[in-house]
Regions:
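Cyclophilin-like peptidyl-prolyl cis-trans isomerases
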Residues: 1-143
Length: 143
């Protein structure tokens, strides 16, 4: 993930969330994320992006099923954003928006499909502001 602040390398885990990883790779390879703004930055919580309009309430026009896994949401975890109703996350409402945790978030639980983590460049994510953008998102290796 190339951002206006620097580069971030993430490791995706298809063994945790195969459909979510496939969705993310397809979006990245198509250029869908290129130019997207980091529209939600909450210090010590999350940095969120993945919508070309920069609107956290925007919908992708499709959803993917939630993929529950036992991974704790520690710092640098990548998971899918969800819609909410009555202050509760709606499972199976993920599409294109994702977030990266800026600190451990164990209370987020298993409703959110965790599909990867930051391998290098966490300092870039930790210093993002809401006007920053992803300039290029591509898959660089198969391993």
């Amino acid at each position: 993930i190339r951002t206006t602040r620097g580069d971030v390398v993430v490791r995706l885990y298809p063994e945790w969330a195969p459909s979510t990883v496939a969705n993310f790779i397809a979006l990245a390879q198509s250029g869908y994320f290129d130019g997207n703004r980091w529209f939600r930055i909450v210090p010590n919580f999350v940095a969120q992006t993945g919508d070309p309009t920069g609107d956290p309430d925007s919908e992708a026009g499709y959803t993917i099923p939630a993929e529950e896994n036992p991974v704790e949401q520690r710092s640098g975890i990548i998971a899918m954003g969800l819609d909410y109703k009555d202050n509760k996350p709606l499972r199976d409402s993920a599409g294109t928006q994702f977030y990266i945790t800026l600190s451990p978030q164990p209370y987020l639980g298993r409703d959110f499909s965790v599909f990867g983590e930051v391998e290098s460049g966490f300092d870039v994510i930790a210093n993002l502001i809401e006007s920053d953008r992803m300039t290029l998102v591509r898959r660089i290796a198969d391993d």
